C-alpha cells in the first residue's frame, strides 16, 4: 500500500484554512469545534495508514527473510 502523503497534507491544510476562515468570519463555536474534530479525524486516519504501511513492510521483510533463509539452507 502506497501512502500519498502530499494528498493528506493538502487535505490537512484545507481543513486548517477552513477553520481559520470560520473563526475569522463566523465566530461560531460549533463550526470551530466541528473543524477541530475533522482535523483530528484526518490526523488519526493518517496515523492509521502509516501504522498499516509499516506493518505491511515488516511482514514483507519477514517473509522475504524467511524465504532467503530457506534458500540458503
For each predicted feature, which ranges?
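Charge-dense, intrinsically disordered terminal/linker segments
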Residues: 1-73
